[in-house]
Amino acid sequence: MIPLRIVLASLACLCPFSLAQEPKSDPDKTLIIISTSDIHGNLDNFPRLATLVKQYRAKYPHVLLVDSGDYFIGNPYVDDCEKRGEPLTILMNKLGYDVVTIGNHDLDYGQEALRDHIEGMPSTKFVITNANLSPTLENCFSPYVSIPIEGTSVSVGFIGLADLQTTDVRKMAGISWTLPDEEHYKGITDRFRLTTTPLTSSSAIWDTAMI
């Protein structure tokens, strides 16, 4: 079993960035997880992100690109598109995003707008996850996804959770949600373990670099 060092690079709002802590382990034994957040339809910095992702993929064979929500609403060019959010979906497909979860502002135009965005993008190549919205939207998402890392015995699990405390209550008709407290996390992770083999200390070394 090959030990795998996992490095997390978090890029909030796609601001100017550089990796604060360059991994020192063998590239073949390193997993890079690049995480973006709160893109809000911002297209301007995607060339920078594309350059960063390209550089890491050139150096490391195992790179995952994920987003933690609030991604497709917040820019008039994206909001007013005939298919709301389509420009973002096209760019995220081109960059090779693996997983995206839903944020509170992804419901700013209501649940039907979110459903239309998801169901109207059949070409979406990334998995959209959420495990704590129900019942009206639950069929739109996968609650979690397990991604096997090629050439290793490791799979990485992503669980999507949304905090809707700041969402307009008028957009919440028919939706119930659970705050991601300790018990909720436990219930979801227990379900996840039924479908995959959990990481153990012998199969992975965690090394976190946040920027």
Language model feature labels by segment:
Residues 17-19:
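Sec/Tat signal peptide C-region and signal peptidase I cleavage site
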Residues 7-15:
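Bacterial N-terminal signal peptides
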Residues 21-211:
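Acidic, metal/ion-coordinating pockets
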Residues 1-7:
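Bacterial N-terminal signal peptides that target proteins for export
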Residues 2, 12, 27-28:
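Residues at the start of alpha-helices and the adjacent loop-to-helix junctions
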